[in-house]
Amino acid sequence: MPSLEAVEAFLVMNESELLQDFLVGLIAAPQLAVFFEKYPRLRKIIDREWPGWQRRLRKRIHDTNVPDDLAQEFTLYQHQLLLGSGEFFRRLPATLAALDSQGSPFSHKAHQLCPDGKITHSDSFHTLFLQQWRLSLVARTLTLHHQVMEQEREMLQQELQQRMQLSGALEPVLVENENAAGRLWDMSRAPTHHGDYQLLVQYGDFLAGQPELLQLAERLGRSRAADPQDHADTQLEIRRVLVREPAVMPEEVSGIHQSDEILRLMPSELSLLGLSELELEFYRRLLEKRLMTYRLQGDAWREQQIQHRVTYRHHQQQPKGPFIVCVDTSGSMGGFHEQCAKAFCLALMRIALADNRRCYIMLFSTAIVQYELTADSGIDQAIRFLSQRFRGGTDLARCLAQTCTLLQQPTWQQADAVVISDFIAQRLPEETQGLINQLQKQDGHCFHAVAMSPHGKPSIMKVFDYIWRFDSGIKGRLLRRWRH
């Protein structure tokens, strides 16, 4: 059974134009126009979806088979095209009967062209019959095409509305620039429920109410400057220069010299011809080109192309490395500590989206749970992370050991390791401390400690490059509220 794509191609229908009209109509929907006015950043991002939509629609058309009755009529039409004029007229009654039995919409028009079985055996009738039949097939194919496109339109509009609703709700929380808006839009493909992403919105509101926590995340997230890289590029270039050389037509006297140029003889040489005794001497010197003559010459300038090597040095900023965030989920980190830790991770996720970095979360207590908030399914993983409850023990050493294992892989070059904890834990093993020290000195990795309590153990925190303190206790909260 032929596909819709094959029938359209045989009938010489412009599929690209049909798809273009469909997509233009989709974007011009009133619901989308209102949304684009509210979130103009997403309008540019939608344009990137066109190639994917076109591939999706073409695949749907390719996979859609035409109905049996249309397939039978299309096959009959193809056979008629292969017949000569005489054979066509001989089989015409059988063709009309086949159209009647198939219930073809063209059957009525075919009988109108052959009233009472009277058929004019001419090439013009043959051509007219096939043209009218083709028009009927094109109309049926277009109807089927529009039905398929209408189904796709409904699914695409529903998908777009869900993604735009999600992107619009999370834009104030996660979007800082155009790059972040594009990555959020790509992440919105993963299915999520309305009630789920509201958790992200709630923590975004909480973060907005804690400006010191947000500022701390900004300072930590952008504390490492992007490493510049010099790139030398040597190539051959053509340089045009002006070269001075003697002119073909002399312009001025520049001295005297020996030559045979009669027109430039000095008067003393001409005097030799006046004495018969010296006349032979004159001719001898003429043959030897030893006559004293004026030297006349001028300057001319000519453009000359010279090839030379030129080295260009490009100073290019390299992208920053990813975040590996270790979050303490022990019981002592519950309550307000838990809210602050989750909001801090959300702020780092926002920075990672804006700076095109990865944000990898590791929850450590008695077991280690991992999430990547900037993956394609990052929104779903962020929701699952925010839904976690902090009720376990503390195994900081195990988490740091696993972090060091990750940092030794090429994927995690220039990564920043961030540990969010109250740092009320057991002393780190000497082996782990030595490994951290090696990663800091040899590989340039930075280890940050975000202390949620003023009672953290100094013996643990001394291994970190930077210590960022945020007092999430009652006293710290009261002081921050009093300042504001």
Swiss-Prot record:
Cited InterPro entries: Uncharacterised_CoxE, Uncharacterised_ViaA, VWF_A, vWFA_dom_sf
- As recorded in UniProt, coiled-coil segments are none
- Family annotation (SUPFAM superfamilies): vWA-like (SSF53300)
Q: Which GO terms describe its cellular component?
A: cytosol
Which of UniProt's keywords are assigned here? Chaperone, Cytoplasm
Keyword Transit peptide on this protein? no
A Pfam family it matches: VWA_CoxE
Q: Where in the cell is it found?
A: Cytoplasm
Query: Which Gene3D superfamilies does the entry link to?
Result: von Willebrand factor, type A domain (3.40.50.410)
- Subunit structure as annotated in this protein's UniProt entry: Homodimer. Interacts with RavA.
Family recorded in the similarity comment:
Belongs to the ViaA family.
PANTHER family the UniProt entry points to: PROTEIN VIAA (PTHR36846:SF1)
Function in brief: Component of the RavA-ViaA chaperone complex, which may act on the membrane to optimize the function of some of the respiratory chains. ViaA stimulates the ATPase activity of RavA.
The protein's matches in NCBIfam families, at most eight in alphabetical order, are given as: PRK10997.1
Task: Spell out the protein name for this chain.
Answer: Regulatory protein ViaA
